[in-house]
């Protein structure tokens, strides 16, 4: 059963535009490869943090809405956690 999820992740601010897009496409491709469907991607761009995170003052924000199985969302969470380019992330299951 496909469920609706939202993921927000913050990428390292020193990545160039090409590398940033390739990372976004990599996570999108992973969801689609597992049988999920990405419904929306919002690129918020670089924003300043309220406080330092990993000695950084800003990051590139991305919000992605998708439909997928629970296992796919768990795998995405794992990949975001181990990626060196991701500063912070959160995966949320949206209520009906």
From Swiss-Prot:
Highest taxon listed in the record's lineage: Bacteria
Keyword terms of this UniProt record: Ribonucleoprotein, Ribosomal protein, RNA-binding, rRNA-binding
CC terms in the record's Gene Ontology section: cytoplasm; ribonucleoprotein complex; ribosome
Cross-referenced InterPro entries: Ribosomal_bS6 (IPR000529), Ribosomal_bS6_sf (IPR035980), Ribosomal_S6_plastid/chlpt (IPR020814), Transl_elong_EF1B/ribsomal_bS6 (IPR014717)
MF terms in GO: small ribosomal subunit rRNA binding; structural constituent of ribosome
GO biological process: translation
Any Pfam family the entry gives: Ribosomal_S6
Annotated NCBIfam families: S6 (TIGR00166)
The protein's role, per its UniProt record: Binds together with bS18 to 16S ribosomal RNA.
Family matches, as HAMAP family: Ribosomal_bS6
Family: Belongs to the bacterial ribosomal protein bS6 family.
UniProt-recorded name of the protein: Small ribosomal subunit protein bS6
Top-level taxonomy: Bacteria, Bacillati, Bacillota, Clostridia, Thermoanaerobacterales
